[in-house]
Amino acid sequence: IRNKSLFLSNMSHEIKTPLNALAGFSEVLTTPGIDEATRVQCNDVIQLNSELLLKLINDVVDISCLDVANMKFSITTHEVVALCRNVVKMLDNIKQTSADIRFETELTSLEIETDQGRLQQMLVNLLVNATKFTKEGSITLALRLDEQGFAEFSVTDTGCGIPLERQSTIFGRFEKLNEGVQGAGLGLSICKLIIKRLGGEIWVDSGYTAGARFVFIHPLKQEVVR
């Protein structure tokens, strides 16, 4: 019962992010004289967050989704450079920190086979987590192709960092760095389940000491049965 309560508490907190985005970007659409490019971008963000919200609600309904075998995935081909830009723009507009949130890549586009909603859920989890521990400075989402041909995503912040002794357990269920920070400590655990199902890996960069850096790799093609 305690685990279910913690799960529901965490999901309630995560649901606030897409809800705030929907409210904020819907308001932008009502701005007089809004240009077409901004209108299209707002519509894209609203659609992405509507899909994310639906997935989160489904997770709340099915608490057993903490078991990767029960998580539902829809694998299709998606362009992820634009996805990253939209996620960063969304969070930059609703952030509760003075830290800058930015996206860095040398890629103009990159298509991968993934579940777009689940990938967005991972990116949002990692970026929102960074805002909790980074009151000033910067939070950077980066995307590149690594030496093995995987898409490598990283979220780097200039916050308080993660003690070395906690880095091996931080992806466990209900693990929290700071008990005073809202949430049940399931966000990173869910990220690990998602990326494992998508054929990748996630880890903490222990060599980065100016804050925290989370890195995950994602294959360009899926080998799993759809």
Residues covered by each model-derived region:
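Helix-loop junction within the histidine kinase core
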Residues: 64-75
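Short alpha-helical segment of the dimerization/phosphotransfer core of two-component systems
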Residues: 48-53
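Short alpha-helical Gxxx[C/S/T] motif in the catalytic ATP-binding
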Residues: 187, 191
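Short conserved segment of the HATPase_c
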Residues: 162-174
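Primarily the dimerization/phosphotransfer
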Residues: 1-31
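Short helix-loop "hinge" at the ATP-lid/N-box region of the Bergerat-fold HATPase_c
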Residues: 130-131
